[in-house]
């Protein structure tokens, strides 16, 4: 009966526990590209889009900081490559996630074949406060956080494509993608409780 209702588009609202109570292990996004990617610059564009989506999902889930980034790559020969690494400090900033993911990607993918799929995820969530050092720029981080929140509000109201990364405009097909909105993967617990 519940399956039939869902098939007809009926949506049931329920009280959702906080992310800490749900014990979310990771948040990520991946994409199988419509054509082979042949160089780092093309892969970099997709990684930045994926990282932007992952960071937005983190904020949406109430998980603002992660300590580990994982990158996944699949060649056109369908061979898969994985690498993960720790961030210098816990972060929820898309740029830092993307830069770490690009660095990991460069270490794991040798370009023996063109690239067909990419994925970025974060894990090892951090719920405590951050001890700043005298070299960190707290004002800049606070401005970035407020900017991210403003972008999230605008995207929620007008759709994810309304504000895009400049890098996606290098490829006309990339700017048509709505990675966050069209590629939703629910945790198992979502289906178990509905």
Model-derived regions, located:
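DNA-contacting surface of Y-family translesion DNA polymerases
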Residues: 6-114
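Acidic, metal-coordinating catalytic segment for phosphate/diphosphate chemistry
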Residues: 89-194
């Amino acid at each position: 009966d519940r399956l039939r209702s869902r098939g007809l588009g009926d949506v049931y609202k329920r009280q959702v526990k906080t992310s800490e109570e749900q014990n979310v292990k990771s948040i990520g996004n991946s994409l199988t590209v419509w054509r082979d990617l042949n160089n780092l610059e093309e892969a970099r564009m997709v990684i930045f889009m994926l990282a932007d989506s992952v960071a937005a999902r983190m904020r949406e889930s109430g998980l603002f900081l992660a300590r580990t980034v994982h990158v996944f790559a699949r060649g056109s020969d369908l061979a898969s490559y994985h690498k993960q690494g720790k961030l210098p400090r816990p972060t929820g900033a898309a740029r830092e996630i993307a830069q770490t993911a690009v660095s990991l990607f460069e270490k794991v993918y040798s370009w023996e074949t063109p690239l067909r799929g990419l994925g970025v995820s974060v894990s090892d969530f951090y719920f405590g406060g951050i001890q700043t050092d005298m070299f960190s720029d707290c004002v800049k981080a606070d401005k970035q956080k407020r900017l991210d929140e403003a972008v999230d509000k605008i995207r929620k109201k007008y759709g994810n494509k309304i504000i895009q990364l400049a890098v996606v405009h290098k490829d006309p097909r990339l700017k048509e993608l709505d990675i966050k909105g069209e590629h939703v993967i629910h945790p198992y617990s979502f289906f178990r409780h509905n």
